[in-house]
Curated annotation (Swiss-Prot):
Biased composition (Polar residues): 141-151, 258-277, 766-777, 851-860, 876-886, 1113-1127, 1284-1300, 1308-1333, 1349-1388
Name recorded for this polypeptide: Nuclear factor of activated T-cells 5
Bias type Basic residues, positions: 217-229
Record location of the Glycyl lysine isopeptide (Lys-Gly) (interchain with G-Cter in SUMO2) cross-link: 572, 619
Modification(s) after translation: Phosphorylated. Phosphorylated at Thr-152 by CDK5 in response to osmotic stress; this phosphorylation mediates its rapid nuclear localization. Poly-ADP-ribosylated by PARP1 in response to DNA damage, promoting recruitment to sites of R-loop-associated DNA damage.
Protein role: Transcription factor involved, among others, in the transcriptional regulation of osmoprotective and inflammatory genes. Binds the DNA consensus sequence 5'-[ACT][AG]TGGAAA[CAT]A[TA][ATC][CA][ATG][GT][GAC][CG][CT]-3'. Mediates the transcriptional response to hypertonicity. Positively regulates the transcription of LCN2 and S100A4 genes; optimal transactivation of these genes requires the presence of DDX5/DDX17. Also involved in the DNA damage response by preventing formation of R-loops; R-loops are composed of a DNA:RNA hybrid and the associated non-template single-stranded DNA.
Species the sequence originates in: Rattus norvegicus
Record PANTHER family: NFAT (PTHR12533), NUCLEAR FACTOR OF ACTIVATED T-CELLS 5 (PTHR12533:SF10)
Compartmental location: Nucleus; Cytoplasm; Chromosome
Length: 1548
């Protein structure tokens, strides 16, 4: 536009014609400007002006306009104006400018421009001419407008009209013509441009806010038009100039300020005049020069503003006010010699020389809560901030309301002209001015500028992020690649010996400028000044640029000349830890790992080195060892890691290396020395060993193992921190690898420890209680040693001895550490480690009680647990699992049979011991002891439980942890790999990681996958418990999905993964169940008990899943993190049972979740709380004992898949975050709660009630079951209504879970009828569950749906409920396990849908499966949704093979319903097995489908054959085969599942 206008002007358009042009054009051009002037077409020019310019008071308008328009149309016209101004400035008379302006404008133009110029003049006169221009412009405009546009003058807005292009044109002319107003010519001269100021003002007003750009640009034609501009009165012309400029031009109308003063005042814009006090009288020209001190009065700056303030564009939003140089205060001004209130004016001036408004920056008002009230005024196109100075403040003011605004280029051009805009200036000053009225009415103006302020973003401070070389010969000349930030021109790279000493040697490195880049450099190392050093010298590298020096000084080492021979050796040896001279050494020394590592490193020095490096440097090195380890997958590597712990340990480890027990033995040996020397360090050192071992077992794990090593070497907090970093790195790798292996557990463990730190503190206390006396521990251990002697005599002996010593040491150290460690996170980890060690010791002891296999494994696991807890239970479990799987696999089958018997007896012994220990340990024991209980339940289970114990101990302290324990105490066992990892350390943090990695980890084999899922689910549960947030639970679901997928279907991975994991969870439960009764343990643990034996068994029967499970269980037992246990999901079940059985549940209730049936019964006998806790896994056969503990509620929960999820959730939610978990577990919680103890049990009881009848409860305590059933029925009835609500919206399930735990109870509690009603109500919810999606959302509700079935299962007596229960029961166990997520309600894990539901989802509802699988709604429920009867069949589909071999085996061990609960993991009965059928051999092995024989009689079948049943050649496998075929048939009959499906459907 400006150019157009200029062309028009040059075309000698009459003022009128331009005006017409202007009005029309401006209207067209500046529709936005027609805000207020929409009415004035004639004022089109005015309309063109921005709204602010026109209607708002000039200063405001001007300011606003300016700020907005500075770059806009106003900007363009102003350039023209600027030119005019420039000419006028040269003329050095405003009048001249004015006249030129007027002259150039024809009358028409003038009218518009007059309006503008008037406005401008007014503006110039009053600092806020723009606004005041309205008045002035009204008058002037009226005249002018009359000349040009009658209508334009009619409105003050005419003034604004004037600003349109014409005005700009006129303005520039006017500036020239301004000569009429000689007054301002000088000032105008001073201003960058006289008209520019006026233009600026107006323009800024209109331009900033509007799209007046075009009009302004039109105005630009002003220069051309100038010649033709008519001259107006000085005032008028000034005003016009000012107005025109300011109207369309940039805000800053420099020139026209003074000239227009009169106009300004006369313009109705009194506001402006008075505002600024810049009336012609008051308001001096902004570009005028005024003294700082006069007549005894002085305006001085007390505090100067900051030297750099990044100005902002109007569109950027505020960057805040200008601060002082401390960044804590604001520039402060004081007026001395005057005691009357005055107005302080602040504007942005140029950076040097005579003060005048800045051409590129404007002041802007900053508003805030506590800022000083101020107002913006537009003077001569420049925004001025006015603040009151008051005597009350001693005439001192901290100016906290002034920011700096950067004008758009268009505004700048409009303001100072195109020529002026080329001279970029990024520095400005704040100019402070006061106008003091003398007694005679005259005004004294004082003005003082601040120091210059740089208004651009400063160059970033350089940083070095990474360098390619850490050490070099003293000769230098090697190239170093530096990666970093902000390497700008002028960068220097300095090598300095002592950075803090400026006089120390320093040298500038030569930079390769050809490859110089902003974020990377290549420099040559300068030679060191002393070429004859004999020891490495550490210097610092930093980068210096104009912006300063890099904050972080990178260490660099000059090594002696290679001639000395030290350099090369050092570099090579220390490559992984080049920081040998650095503080890492201390950490290493503290670790005492160097010597040990070397010894143990026999096989893998790299691994040793990595642990040694445990500092940041080690990080890199660790990664390599991890890779190596994964490749080698050899126990020596882990041993190497273990070596880090202690020389003795190394020896023990080496001896252990010979056999699978070696891992546990190294752990034990490691524990004892480290415990004595440094308990804190010991757990950490321990961890590395465990990790290493795990890595050996799982290829993926090796990556994790170094981290574990590092964490195990936590002895020094520095080392620990460094290792933690390493861990995290490994964690990432771990997860990837773990997805196929138990490595996942490791990474999760890493996170878990942090989450569990507080729990760890508690745990530290608990461990002492748990292990009340070393004597008892040693007794247990000796017993274990004897038992272990059977399976792993050699390794067991060393491991258990170490364990006993460790237990004693750990107890002592833990007590000490508990006091010390509790205070610090490091301490927490140490406590956790110690706790784990204790737990592991207990579990070891328990293992001794349990069959030799378990004891041996436990010994190894136990040893690891200490390591694992601090470092990562995960890796330990993985190690154990792998070791067990590889070494023990062969032994496992042989030993398993032997050990099964031993396990049964030892399990009973362990359970007894556990009970006694639990009782003695009290809360701490109950928390910590659940692992002991698990140990009793089964070796594998004990490790899992141990970690749950940790969780539990932690959980009791924090409710979240409690929930985790409850839900997860079993899940950790189940998780095996992941659970153990996540249980203690990472339970809370990576629920998803848990689940996902377990999937991958277990994914190695079908069995392994099932385990993974299991571990994932349980890990998630553990995580949830630990984290106390439900996030992990959500992950849990996915993991379950994977489990289910692995077992049955890919689709079920989403929702089914939950179910799948549910199956695995069942396995976990079976672990609980196992513990529950020696039988169940024996069967579950037969694979589990002999770690090697169980492993072989698991591996063969279960395939990877169970095989892993066994090792996992063992690992879990030893690790106490269910990491490996989880992979051996079914073992995990035993472990879970153990966990629940341990006293931990009593205190924490949540830990009880995984008590074995026996333990549950004991717990029930011992404590209702334990029962409740146990109830989590009690749900099915194993669960039933748990349920007995937790009452019928738990069973009900487990019986039905929904109950399972409820149970899981309730376990978590009840104990820890029932409310939080409620959403997820609410139905479970509610169910569990009602029957269970009033507190957690209210929530948990109903869930468990349902579960309990499911399996274990029935066999374990018929009376309890009946009671539970009754409670359930009552609760169901009560809750049915609630539950109907709950179920009414499956999502509500989560809601309900969070909102009401009792309603969830209802959900679970309801027996068949209540369940049916609830389910009916829920049907949509559960049906949705069937549609995996709702299940994902609710997860819990899904479990709830099958609850009626669960209730039926609970009460063998009630046939109707039982049949539904049967179907439900199968699925329910899975669900239950899944839900064992920690208190994280958020993730309310309805993870454990009944397998039937899962199968239904898979087979019947592939699509729903996806939706539902995440939720894993009860199998029955899902089938019910699908076809009422289908649920069992779908379940079968999910767990096709599960029902046959594995589950039967698991259940068979328990023989009784209790055992079934042990099988609970895959409590899918027939359906479950069908689900597993996908790979009958593999899936059953993996999932060990807990199909209870596949018949509605879940209880009868509840003695699910060992999870490994298929792989294992037990009667269970036969049953599983039958079940499988039955399941297949059922799958075919999915829609018409009768025995289970009918009831389920009815319930549904």
């Amino acid at each position: 536009m400006p150019s157009d206008f200029i062309s028009l002007l040059s075309a000698d358009l009459d003022l009128e014609s331009p005006k017409s042009l202007y009005s029309r054009d401006s209207l067209k051009l500046h529709p936005s400007q027609n805000f207020h002037r929409a009415g004035l077409l004639e004022e089109s020019v005015y309309d063109l002006l921005p709204k602010e310019l026109q209607l708002p008071p000039p200063r405001e308008t001007s300011a606003a306009s300016m700020s907005q328009t500075s770059g806009g149309e106003a900007g363009s016209p102003p350039p023209a104006v600027v030119a005019a101004d420039a000419s006028s400035a040269p003329s050095s008379s405003m009048g001249g400018a004015c006249s030129s302006f007027t002259t150039s404008s024809s009358p028409t133009i003038y009218s518009t421009s007059v309006t503008d110029s008037k406005a401008m003049q007014v503006e110039s006169c009053s600092s806020a001419v723009g606004v005041s221009n309205r008045g002035v412009s009204e008058k002037q405009l009226t005249g002018n407008t009359v000349q040009q546009h009658p209508s334009t003058p009619k409105r003050h807005t005419v003034l604004y009209i004037s600003p349109p292009p014409e005005d700009l044109l006129d303005n520039s002319r006017m500036s020239c013509q301004d000569e009429g107003c000689g007054l301002e010519s000088e000032q105008s001269c001073s201003m960058w441009m006289e008209d520019s100021p006026s233009n600026f003002s107006n323009m800024s007003t209109s331009s900033y806010n509007d799209n007046t750009e075009v009009p302004r640009k039109s105005r630009k034609r002003n220069p051309k038009q100038r010649p033709g501009v008519k001259r107006r009165d000085c005032e008028e012309s000034n005003m016009d100039i000012f107005d025109a400029d300011s109207a369309k031009a940039p805000h800053y109308v420099l020139s026209q300020l003074t000239t227009d003063n009169k106009g300004n005042s006369k313009a109705g814009n009194g506001t402006l005049d008075s505002q600024k006090g810049t009336g012609v009288k008051k308001s001096p020209m902004l570009c005028g020069q005024y003294p700082v001190k006069s007549e005894g009065k002085e305006l001085k700056i007390v505090v100067q503003p900051e030297t750099q303030h990044r100005a902002r564009y109007l569109t950027e939003g505020s960057r805040g006010s200008v601060k002082d140089r401390t960044q804590q205060g604001f520039p402060t001004v004081k007026l001395e010699g005057h005691n009357e209130p005055v107005v302080l004016q602040v504007f942005v001036g140029n950076d040097s020389g005579r003060v005048k408004p800045h051409g590129f920056y404007q002041a802007c008002r900053v508003t805030g809560r506590n800022t000083t009230p101020c107002k913006e005024v537009d003077i001569e196109g420049t925004t001025v901030i006015e603040v009151g100075l008051d005597p009350s403040s001693n005439m001192t003011l901290a100016v906290d309301c002034v920011g700096i605004l950067k004008l758009r280029n268009a505004d700048v051009e409009a303001r100072i002209g195109i020529a002026g805009s080329k001279k970029k200036s990024t520095r400005a000053r704040l100019v402070f001015r006061v106008n003091i009225t003398r007694k005679d009415g005259s005004t004294l103006t004082l003005q003082t500028p601040s120091s210059p302020i740089l208004c651009t973003q400063p160059a970033g401070v350089p940083e070095i992020l990474k360098k390619s070389l850490h050490s070099c010969s003293v000769k230098g000349e090697e190239e170093v690649f530096l990666i970093g930030k902000n390497f700008l021109k002028g960068t220097k790279v300095i090598f300095q010996e002592n950075v803090s000493d400026e006089n120390s040697w320093k040298s500038e490195a030569e930079i390769d400028m050809e490859l110089f880049h902003q974020n990377h450099l290549i420099v040559k190392v300068p030679p060191y000044h002393d070429q004859h050093i004999t020891l490495p010298v550490s210097v610092g590298i930093y980068v210096v640029t104009n912006a300063g020096r890099s904050h972080d000084v990178q260490p660099f080492t000059y090594t002696p000349d290679p001639a000395a021979g030290a350099l090369s050796v050092n570099v090579k040896k220390e490559i992984s830890s080049p920081a040998r001279p650095c503080s890492f050494e201390e950490a290493l020394k503290a670790m005492k790992t160097t010597g040990c590592n070397v010894d143990k490193v026999t096989i893998l020095p790299n691994a040793l080195i990595t642990p040694l490096i445990s500092s940041s440097m080690i990080k890199t090195e660790d990664v390599t060892p991890m890779e190596v380890t994964s490749e080698k997958r050899s126990s020596p590597i882990f041993q190497t890691t273990k070596t880090v712990g202690s020389t003795q340990q190394t020896l023990e480890t080496i001896s252990n290396i010979a056999g699978n027990a070696s891992f546990s033995s190294p752990s034990s040996s490691h524990l004892s020395p480290e415990n004595e020397n440094q308990q804190q360090l010991q757990p950490k050192a321990y961890n590395p060993e465990t990790l290493t071992t795990i890595q050996t077992q799982d290829i993926s794990q090796p990556g994790t193992f170094p981290a574990v090593s590092a964490s195990s070497q936590l002895p020094s907090s520095d080392a620990l921190l460094q290792q933690a970093a390493q861990f995290q790195t490994r964690d990432a790798q771990s997860r990837d690898t773990m997805q196929s292996d138990s490595v996942v557990n490791l990474s999760q463990l890493t996170e878990a420890p942090q989450q569990q730190q507080s729990p760890l503190q508690e745990q530290a206390q608990i461990p002492s209680n748990i292990f009340p006396s070393p004597n008892s521990v040693s007794q247990l251990q000796s017993t274990i040693q004897q038992l272990q002697a059977g399976s792993f005599t050699g390794s067991t002996a060393s491991g258990s001895n170490g364990s006993v010593d460790l237990v004693q040491q750990v107890l002592e150290a833990q007590q000490q550490l508990s006091s010390v460690l509790f205070s610090t996170p490091d301490g927490n980890e140490n406590v956790q480690e110690q706790l784990n060690a204790d737990i592991f010791q207990v579990s070891q002891i328990q293992n001794s009680v349990s069959p030799g296999m378990f004891s041996s494994t436990e010994s190894a696991v136990h040893t690891r647990p200490d390591n694992l807890l601090p470092g990562r239970a995960d890796s330990v479990h993985q190690q154990t699992e792998n070791t067990l799987s590889s070494q023990q696999q062969q032994q496992q089958q042989q030993q398993q049979q032997q050990q099964q018997q031993v396990i049964e007896s030892s399990a009973a012994m362990v359970m007894e011991m556990q009970q006694s220990i639990c009782q003695a340990a009290a809360q701490i024991q109950s928390e910590l002891f659940p692992s002991a209980a698990s140990a009793n339940g089964s070796l594998q289970q004990s490790p899992v439980y141990q970690q749950p114990s940790h969780m539990m101990s932690a959980l009791p302290t924090s409710e979240d942890m409690q929930m985790q324990c409850e839900l997860f105490s079993s899940p950790p066992a189940v998780s095996g790999n992941e659970t153990s990892t996540t249980t203690t350390p990472q339970v809370a943090t990576p629920g998803s990681t848990m689940f996902q990695p377990p999937n991958s980890g277990d994914g190695e084999e079908t069995g392994a996958q099932a385990k993974q899922i299991q571990s994932s689910v349980f890990q998630t549960m553990v995580q949830m418990q630990h984290s106390g947030d439900s996030q992990p639970q959500v992950n849990l679901f996915s993991s379950t999905k994977n489990i289910m997928s692995v077992q049955s279907n890919g689709t079920q991975q989403q929702g089914n993964s939950l179910f799948q994991q549910g199956s695995e969870m069942l396995s976990l439960q079976s672990g609980s169940f196992l513990q529950q009764s020696s039988h169940s343990q024996a069967q579950l643990f037969h694979p589990q008990n002999p770690i090697a034996d169980a492993q072989s068994l698991s591996q063969e029967t279960q395939g990877p899943m169970f095989h892993s499970a066994n090792p996992i269980v063992h690992s879990q037992t030893s690790t106490a993190s269910s990491e490996q246990l989880q992979p051996s999901m079914f073992h995990s079940q035993s472990t879970i049972a153990v966990l629940q059985g341990s006293s931990v549940p009593q205190d924490q209730q949540s830990p009880n979740i995984y008590l074995s049936q026996s333990s549950i019964s004991n717990l029930q006998t011992n404590t209702v709380a334990q029962e409740e806790q146990i109830s989590f896994f009690s749900a099915q056969n194993s669960i039933s004992p748990l349920q007995s503990t937790s009452n019928t509620e738990q069973q009900a929960a487990f019986q039905q898949q929904p109950p399972i999820s409820h149970i899981q959730t309730p376990l978590l939610s009840q104990e820890q975050a029932q409310p939080s978990q409620q959403g997820l577990f609410q139905p479970q919680v509610a169910l569990g709660s009602l029957p269970a103890n009033p507190m957690p049990q209210n929530q948990q009881g109903p869930i468990f009630q349902t579960q309990r009848p499911i399996v274990g409860m029935q066999s374990n305590s018929p009376s309890q079951e009946q009671q539970q059933q009754q409670q359930q029925q009552q609760q169901q009835q009560q809750q049915q209504q609630q539950q109907s609500i709950l179920f009414s919206n499956q999502n509500a399930m989560a809601t309900m879970a969070s909102q009401k735990q009792p309603p969830p109870n209802m959900i679970f509690s309801p027996n068949q009828n209540p369940m049916a009603s609830q389910e009916q109500q829920n049907q949509s919810i559960f049906h949705q569950q069937s549609n995996m999606a709702p299940m994902n959302q609710e997860q819990q509700p899904m479990q709830f749906q099958n609850q009626p079935t669960v209730s039926s299962l609970q009460n063998p007596g009630p046939t109707p409920s039982e049949s539904p229960q049967t179907s439900l029961f199968h699925s329910s166990p899975q669900i239950q396990l899944v839900q064992g997520s920690p208190s994280s309600q958020e993730q309310q894990v309805t993870l454990f849908l009944s397998p039937a539901s899962m199968s239904a989802l898979q087979t019947s509802i592939n699509q729903p499966d996806m939706q539902q699988s995440p939720l894993y709604s009860p199998q029955n429920n899902i089938p019910g949704i699908q076809g009422s009867t289908s649920s069992p069949q779908p379940q079968a589909a999910l767990f096709h093979n599960t029902t046959g071999g594995t589950i039967n085996q698991l259940q068979n061990s328990p023989g009784s319903s209790q055992q079934t609960s042990g099988m609970f993991l895959f409590g899918i009965q027939n359906n479950c097995s069908q689900l597993l059928t996908s790979g009958p051999a593999t899936l059953p092995e993996q999932l060990m489908a807990i199909n209870q024989p596949g018949q509605p009689q879940n209880e009868g079948q509840s003695s699910v054959t060992t999870l490994l049943s298929q792989q294992m050649p037990e009667s269970a496998p036969l049953a599983s085969s039958v079940n499988n075929s039955q399941n297949m048939e059922k799958i075919d009959l999915l829609v018409s599942l009768q025995s289970q499906g009918n009831n389920l459907t009815g319930s549904f």
